[in-house]
Amino acid sequence: MPPELPIEHEMKSSVRGMYLASHFYNFWHAAPMEEVTPFIEDLALWGCNTLMLCLAPQHYRSFTSPEAFETADRLKKIFACAAELGIAPALILFSNTGFLDRSEDIAAPWDMRGEYITPNYAELHKEICPNLPGGMDEIRRCHREFFELFSDVPVKYFAYWAYDEGGCTCDACSRWSENGFIKVYEESVKPLLSEYFPDAKLILSTWHFDRHLRDEGKRLYENLSAGKYPWAEYVMAVYGDGQFMPLTAEHGAPDGRSVIDFPEISMWGGKPWGGYGANPLTMRLDNFFSSVGDVLDGGFPYSEGFWENINEFCCMSHYSGAHADTADAVRDYVRFYFGINDPEPLLRAVELLEITLWRKVETMPDGRLRVTPHFPAAIREAYRLVTEADAAMNDTAKRDPRWRIIYLRAVIDYELYTHDFIPMNSARAQKCFRELWALYHAYDTRIQPAVCPPLGR
C-alpha cells in the first residue's frame, strides 16, 4: 500500500516522546536488548523524537555503586540505539529523593499535617528534607552523582519531579511544590545543570499535583502565568489528575510555556499491569486528546512494558498528526502489523477489550485469585473476533509479540468468563500466563508483583 501522507508532512507536535519506565524488572528493565530494539525502531517509524528513561536513587546506596552502574549502562545502550534513529535522550530528575541508606536524621516527614489532605505518597520513602541540617548537602550529592553518571549522554530534557518519588510535608517546606521543591531547584538543580548540562531543557512535572494539597494545579497555573519559574520551559500536565490540565484546555498554555501531556497507558484497569495481555485504551485516549484540542505540544506516554503497544501507537499518531482519531490509527496498526485488509472486525475487538479491561482482583481464603471484569458481557464477542482473525493470519503475524498479547488477552478473559473468574480453574489460562511470563521475561526472581502476570495464582 503506498504511503498516504505527503512527503512534506509537518509534525503536529514538537515533543513526540515516550517514557519507558525501566524499573521493577519489567520488560524495559530486564529483556535482552535484541528484543527491546525493535520497539524503539517502531517508535522512530511512528515519529518519536525523544525517549525518556529513569534511574531512581531510592533503589541504590549510591550512583557510584556497581548496581547503579549496571542499570545506567543498560539505559545508555537504549539511548544509543534511539540516537541512531534520531531520537534524543531525556531523563527524569528527582527533586529530594535520597539513596536506599538515607539517614533518618535528614528524613523528610510524609504524614498529613497543615494543609495536606493526604500523606505524601512514595514507594520507599527515602525523601530528604532540604531544610534539615545536612539535608541540602545530601540532595546535592545525589544530584551530582546522577549528573556525573550521565555526563557522557547528550541529554536534551530533564523532567523535574515533585512527587512519587519526592516531597516533604514539614512546615519549613510547605507548600512543597511552591516552596521546598523550588528551593531544591535553586540551590541544587540549577547550579549543577549549569555545570553538567547547560543546554538541557527543563520540564516541570505535575504528576500527583492536587493529590496532597488543594489548588496545587491552579496555583501553579497562576504562578506560571505571572512569569514565575522561567526555567520551566515545558510543563508536563496529567489527565484527570488535578486542575492544571483543565485550566490549560480552557485558557491556553500559561505565559507561552510549552505544555505537554503524560498519558498513563500502562497501569489503568488494575494490577498486575499487563498481567492479562494487551490493555488497549484507544477510546480513553481519544477522550483525553479531544478534551484539550490543539493546546498541547506533545508528551511522554508512560510505558511499563509492550503490552500497551497499540496505545503507544495511538499517542504517537496524535502527536504526529498522522490520524484524525484513534480508530483510524488502530485501522492502520492492524493493516501494517497483522496484514489484515479489512480492519473493522479487529477494531471492534480492540474496543471490546478496552471495555472489559477494568477488573476487580480479589484473593480468596484459599489463596487463589478471583478476577472479575466489571463489564464481562463483551468477553465472548471479543474472543470470537480475535480467534477468527488469528485463524486467518499468516504464521509470521501470528508469532508477532504485538499480536500474541492481544490474542492471549482475549483467551485469558474467555477462560475467566467460563471458569467462575478463577484463573487457577483453567489449565488453558495458566498456559497463557506462562507465555506472558516468557514474553515479559518475568522469570527474573527480582521482578515486582505489579508487573508479573499471575501465573499459579
PLM regions with names:
Residues 2-50, 54:
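An acidic-aromatic substrate-binding cleft motif
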Residues 303-308, 323-457:
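C-terminal non-catalytic alpha-helical accessory regions
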Residues 21-23, 37, 49-56, 61-343, ...:
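Catalytic-core regions of glycoside hydrolase
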Residues 12, 140, 147-148, 292-294, ...:
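Short, surface-exposed loop and linker segments with low hydrophobicity and enrichment for Pro/Ser/Thr
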